[in-house]
Swiss-Prot record:
<feature type="binding site">
    <location>
        <position position="256"/>
    </location>
    <ligand>
        <name>Mn(2+) 2</name>
    </ligand>
</feature>
<feature type="binding site">
    <location>
        <position position="251"/>
    </location>
    <ligand>
        <name>Mn(2+) 2</name>
    </ligand>
</feature>
<protein>
    <recommendedName>
        <fullName>Probable cytosol aminopeptidase</fullName>
        <ecNumber>3.4.11.1</ecNumber>
        <ecNumber>3.4.11.10</ecNumber>
    </recommendedName>
</protein>
<keyword id="KW-0378">Hydrolase</keyword>
<dbReference type="InterPro" id="IPR000819">
    <property type="entry name" value="Peptidase_M17_C"/>
</dbReference>
<feature type="active site">
    <location>
        <position position="263"/>
    </location>
</feature>
<dbReference type="InterPro" id="IPR008283">
    <property type="entry name" value="Peptidase_M17_N"/>
</dbReference>
<dbReference type="GO" id="GO:0070006">
    <property type="term" value="F:metalloaminopeptidase activity"/>
</dbReference>
<dbReference type="GO" id="GO:0005737">
    <property type="term" value="C:cytoplasm"/>
</dbReference>
<feature type="active site">
    <location>
        <position position="337"/>
    </location>
</feature>
<keyword id="KW-0645">Protease</keyword>
<dbReference type="InterPro" id="IPR043472">
    <property type="entry name" value="Macro_dom-like"/>
</dbReference>
<dbReference type="GO" id="GO:0030145">
    <property type="term" value="F:manganese ion binding"/>
</dbReference>
<keyword id="KW-0963">Cytoplasm</keyword>
<comment type="similarity">
    <text>Belongs to the peptidase M17 family.</text>
</comment>
<dbReference type="Pfam" id="PF02789">
    <property type="entry name" value="Peptidase_M17_N"/>
</dbReference>
<feature type="binding site">
    <location>
        <position position="335"/>
    </location>
    <ligand>
        <name>Mn(2+) 1</name>
    </ligand>
</feature>
Length: 496
């Protein structure tokens, strides 16, 4: 699917040939004398159309319009939130087999973030999972044209939005795949494909190299599976070599049974999504490859399965992490923090400016925040503010949670330096306190995406969050935001 940005007035859009023309109608719409403006004005006057976000009126083959179908779509204040809400009401149309070319025209100048919201809504709404289906219909939508009053002024936001959409889709695709189609080795192979882009490098370590590094916690989780672990190291080099990188660490449990502390059978299939953090790191690098910001980024993915087996780690076992600290594993289903702690220790070798880990870590975070906001834990106030701001701008919000030292009391162990769990109370916080022991003085943040990485029910599937948040954060840190595409075409291709 290709996205295209054009300078297109409401009057000119009437001559644009497409299967679906969407006219976003904001509050205070001022009609001109052209056919579409007249149509909007009449619909508003007769009460057939409201400007409330998501209210719409459909017309088929109206006179004087080249599009086969026209949708007049209310978008309220026309800000990012209102445009997203409006576009979600239209989402089913983007999967219709007859809709191959869509034009989306803003009735007035688009507010900051509105173009990004529109691009993301179309990309998300038209996404079709086909990887393991033999008769699945592929995505029908081939081209999306965004018409704005001034394409040149909108170009930076458009470039970011299309790159983020591609990254989100890459993350969704890998998080959606069944565990036998997304083993640690296959996830590592997906990371290697990103190295074809300029500025991106990939290195993959196997069990022998990980053992040599002394990653006893990571090895302990993986030892119950026949699938060999992989430690993926992605690098994006967009700035001077002397510039300290931001390190992203994504939890990559490609299937989580809970190990010996076995999970209930109901909905265990959803544990293929336990590599949502890893998928988000892949998605971020997919977006960075397009945007090429002036920043250095390292992505680490400790990938393995957590399986019950005669070789599996047992409750009560004590292991030595890469940091040298010993851990009593009271619950083998608290495995994500075990693979992350060694990856966080490994991250120190890059002398990072900041470290952000991303993990579907705790059910407690789902209880606390639901599926709207990711949980944010941070050792540094400035880093926390930067991530909160980026999440708001990207419509991928998070919420800062506490990290008081007293929460770590429950991690005390009689047989090791610490236990891997501290009881049910404050479970998401105690998990973050566990991770904090492995980051030293480096500014560090932990995003618990257990409630936001996927959704259940009829629309079960990965969301691709928090790719948008992370990309916006990295762009904010970069000295040069993007390399502009050729002005002539103003088009971007997303992941198909």
């Amino acid at each position: 699917m290709n996205f295209e940005l054009k300078t297109l007035s409401l009057a000119a859009s009437a001559a644009h040939k497409c299967d679906l023309l969407v006219v976003l109608v904001p509050e205070g719409f001022l009609p001109g004398s052209d056919v579409l403006s007249t149509m909007v004005a009449h619909a508003l006057k007769q009460g057939d159309l409201e400007v409330k976000p998501g209210k719409l009126l459909q017309c088929y083959a109206p006179a004087g319009v080249a599009a086969r179908r026209v949708v007049l779509l209310g978008c309220g204040a026309a800000d990012a939130h209102a445009v997203r809400q409006a576009m979600q009401a239209l989402s089913p149309s983007f999967k219709l087999p007859s809709v191959k070319r869509v034009a989306l025209v803003f009735g007035t100048s688009a507010q900051r973030g509105a173009i990004g919201a529109a691009v993301r809504a179309v990309a998300d709404g038209s996404y079709v999972y086909t990887a393991t289906k033999t008769k699945a219909e592929p995505r029908a939508l081939l081209r999306v044209t965004l018409g704005v009053p001034n394409a040149g002024a909108a170009q930076p936001e458009f470039a970011t939005a299309t790159a983020v959409a591609a990254g989100v889709e890459f993350a969704r695709e890998w998080a959606n795949r069944p565990a036998n189609h997304a083993t640690p080795t296959l996830v590592a192979n997906a990371a290697k494909t990103l190295a074809k882009y300029p500025g991106v490098q990939c290195q993959v370590l196997g069990p022998a190299e990980v053992a040599k590094l002394g990653m006893g916690a990571f090895l302990a989780v993986a030892q119950g599976s026949d699938q060999p672990l992989r430690l993926v190291e992605l690098r994006y080099n967009g700035a001077a070599r002397t510039q300290a990188p931001v390190v992203l660490v994504g939890k990559g449990i490609t299937f989580d049974t809970g190990g010996i502390s076995l999970k209930p059978a109901a909905e265990m299939d959803e544990m293929k999504f336990d590599m949502g953090g890893a998928a988000s790191v892949l998605g971020v690098f997919r977006a960075l490859a397009e945007l090429r910001p002036a920043i250095n980024v390292v992505g680490l993915i400790p990938a393995c399965e957590n399986m019950p087996d005669g070789k599996a780690v047992k409750p009560g076992d004590v292991v030595t992490s890469m940091s040298g600290q010993t851990i009593e594993i009271l619950n083998t289903d608290a495995e994500g923090r075990l693979v992350l702690c060694d990856a966080l220790t490994y991250a120190a070798r890059f002398k990072p400016a900041a470290v952000v880990d991303i993990a579907t870590l705790t059910g407690a975070c789902v209880v606390a925040l639901g599926g709207l906001r990711s949980g944010l834990f941070a050792s540094d106030d400035l880093l926390a503010e930067q991530l909160l701001s980026a999440g708001d701008a990207a419509l991928d919000p998070c919420w800062r949670m506490p990290l008081d030292d007293e929460y770590a009391e429950g991690l005390k162990s009689n047989f090791a330096d610490m236990a891997n769990v501290a009881g049910r109370a404050g479970g998401s916080i105690t998990a973050a306190k566990f991770l904090q022991r492995f980051v030293g003085d480096t500014p560090w943040a932990h995003l618990d995406i257990a409630g936001t990485a996927w959704k259940g029910g009829a629309a079960k599937g990965a969301t691709g969050r928090p790719v948008a948040l992370l990309v916006h954060y990295l762009l904010d840190q970069a000295t040069v935001s993007t390399v502009k595409p050729k002005q002539k075409t103003r088009s971007r291709k997303s992941v198909a």
